[in-house]
Amino acid sequence: MEIVSAAARDYHTRPDMKFHPFIALRAAPEFAGAIAAPPYDVVDRAESRQWAERNPRCFLRVSRPDLEFPDATPPDDPAVYRRAAERFAQFRAEGWLIRDTGPAFYLYRIADAAWEQRGVVGVCVVSDYESGAIRRHEKTRAAPEADRIRHTEAINANAGPVLLAWPGDPRVAALCAEAERGEPLYAIRRPDGVRHTIWHFSRSEPLAELFG
């Protein structure tokens, strides 16, 4: 399934956005199943504790560090962000996260028995969001925005993806199909039956040219 938003109708009349390969800090393959976790904002503190229970490698310990604090501790307490930085440093020091040697794009597919969707993983720039080249697709609240800003500053990394929709291009689809024929970096099946598969594009140049 290709994701297309209503904003796609005037895509070609809007300023071109920049989308680049990047040097990823990603899960070591042998630990990927333990590290994989739901997005921080779809589980509450109690649920995140259940995910992280007896699993020191659960990434919610980085993305939702308030799980390690008493319920009376506000999620935006400075100590919570310090804990995020500590856990992120631990994940790197233990070798649970590894740094790629060069910039690349990645293909991410999510699927179950009834549906599937794909996305190319890369980096965009904040100035494109500010200029309107990237259109907002929802109204967000100030408090959660401030929380993620502080979290990003604390760990000096993006702990989760920002999802963008675009009209699509058959040339990009062909490159994605080619990548899917290769060996994936990760193939994880969650208890709910959803399969998460990620491939590394062996060459970034063709995609970089198409994305501009």
Regions found by a protein language model. Give the residues of each.
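A cross-family signal for N-terminal binding/gating loops and helix N-caps
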Residues: 2-212
